[in-house]
């Protein structure tokens, strides 16, 4: 992350929806700085750090994460990813690649939503067995879609690989053996983590493996750097 910042990424001080964005910014060697907001402790989980400025940033749809790049002010995590990716030709080139990008982008968000609902549910322990029972079927679909390709759009790295890496990693933390039956997914994870800029970031002080979720979550809410 360069000190000569041009972009500003705003989000909670967790991985959450911003991890894939951070990875893409690092991979593309984009100059940026972060504005991290802290959620208060239980029982109130005070969000005033964010709420005090939420409507003062001139955002069309005020929310986290946001990206400020000069006159361009963007919310929605996938819109931010696409904005960065377009600058580096990472949205797919052929029609087939673009179709695969669109499919996996939305499939990942469905997958992420399921995990988020589980992690924030007061019935977390009750619902966890069903999630774990259905997880292999979910992962099998990703494995079959990837097939023998190096990346999820084909043989060229696109922004959806950053999204997919993140959700697979979250599930790998949730259930450490979940990828064992899917060698192509494990190879994808290794391939992604071996990218020079990604490897450097994951080994840096800027990266924290946890918390994935905010403090009111039932899982993934503890800091582990």
UniProtKB/Swiss-Prot annotation:
Q: Gene name, please?
A: GSTM3
Catalytic reactions of this protein: RX + glutathione = an S-substituted glutathione + a halide anion + H(+)
Q: Has the keyword NAD been applied to this entry?
A: no
Q: What is this protein called?
A: Glutathione S-transferase Mu 3
Organism source for this protein?
A: Homo sapiens
| Residues where substrate binds | 120
UniProt family annotation = Belongs to the GST superfamily. Mu family.
Q: Which residues bind glutathione?
A: 11-12, 50-54, 63-64, 76-77
| Post-translational modification note | The N-terminus is blocked.
How is this protein annotated for GO cellular component?
cytoplasm; cytosol; extracellular exosome; intercellular bridge; nucleus; sperm fibrous sheath
Alphabetically ordered keywords of this record? Cytoplasm, Isopeptide bond, Transferase, Ubl conjugation
Tissues showing expression: Testis and brain.
| Subcellular compartments | Cytoplasm
């Amino acid at each position: 992350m360069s000190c000569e910042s041009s972009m500003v990424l705003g989000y909670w001080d967790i991985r959450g929806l911003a991890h894939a964005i951070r990875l893409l910014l690092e991979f593309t060697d984009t100059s940026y700085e972060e504005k991290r907001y802290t959620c208060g402790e239980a029982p109130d989980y005070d969000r005033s750090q964010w709420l005090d400025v939420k409507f003062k940033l001139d955002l069309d749809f005020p929310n986290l994460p946001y990206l400020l790049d000069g006159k361009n002010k963007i919310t929605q995590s996938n819109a931010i990813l696409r904005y960065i990716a377009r600058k580096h030709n990472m949205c797919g080139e052929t029609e087939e690649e673009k179709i695969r990008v669109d499919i996996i982008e939305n499939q990942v968000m469905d997958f992420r939503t399921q995990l988020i609902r589980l992690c924030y549910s007061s019935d977390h322990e009750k619902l966890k067995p069903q999630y774990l029972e259905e997880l292999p079927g979910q992962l099998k679909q990703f494995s079959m879609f990837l097939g023998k390709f190096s990346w999820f759009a084909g043989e060229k790295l696109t922004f959806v690989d950053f999204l997919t890496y993140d959700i697979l990693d979250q599930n790998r933390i949730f259930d450490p053996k979940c990828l064992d039956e899917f060698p192509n997914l494990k190879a994808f994870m290794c391939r992604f983590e071996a990218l020079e800029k990604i490897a450097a970031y994951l080994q840096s002080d800027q990266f924290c493996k946890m918390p994935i979720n905010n403090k009111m979550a039932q899982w993934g809410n503890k800091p582990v750097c």
